Amino acid sequence: MGEFQHAIDAKGRLIIPAKLREGLGERFIATKGLDRCLFVFPLAEFEAVSQKLRGLGMSSSAARAFNRLFFSGATECELDPQGRILLPANLREYAGIQKDCVIVGVENRVEIWAAERWAEYSEEAGELYTEIAEKLGF
C-alpha cells in the first residue's frame, strides 16, 4: 500500500520503496499494465495471474490480444543492493516513463506510473471516487 515518488536514473533504474520491497521479494515480474502503467507482481502472484489468463483459452480474439501484450512485456526483475530495479526501455516507453515516476502499492501488485499520467488519472478517478464506490457496493 502507499504512493511514492521517485525518479528513474539515466540507466533506467528505479528505487523500489522499502515498504513495497517486502511484499515483492527479491525477484519479481514487471509487465505492461492497464491504463498505461506497469504492473509488478511477486513471482507467485504472477503465476496465479498467468494461470487465470491461460484459462481464457485461445478462441477469443480479445483473450489472444490481451495475452500477447501482457506476456510480451513481461520481464523478470531483481533488486540490486541499493533496492533498485532496471526497467527495460520497452516498458518505460509503454508507460511513458522518462524520469519522474509514482510507485503505487495496490493489493496484490505494485504499479509504476509516469508522474504526469498518475496525476491525470488520479484527478479523473478522484472525481468519480464516490460514484465508483457506490457501484462496487462499498
Curated annotation (Swiss-Prot):
A GO MF label: transcription cis-regulatory region binding
Subcellular location: Cytoplasm, Nucleoid
BP GO annotations: negative regulation of DNA-templated transcription initiation
Keywords attached to this entry: Cytoplasm, DNA-binding, Repeat, Transcription, Transcription regulation
Signal peptide (residue range): none
Highest taxon in the source lineage: Bacteria
Pfam families: MraZ
One GO cellular component term: cytoplasm
Domain SpoVT-AbrB: 3-45, 74-117
Subunit structure: Forms oligomers.
Similarity field: Belongs to the MraZ family.
PANTHER family for the chain: TRANSCRIPTIONAL REGULATOR MRAZ
Protein name: Transcriptional regulator MraZ
Source organism phylogeny: Bacteria, Bacillati, Bacillota, Clostridia, Eubacteriales
Gene coding for it: mraZ
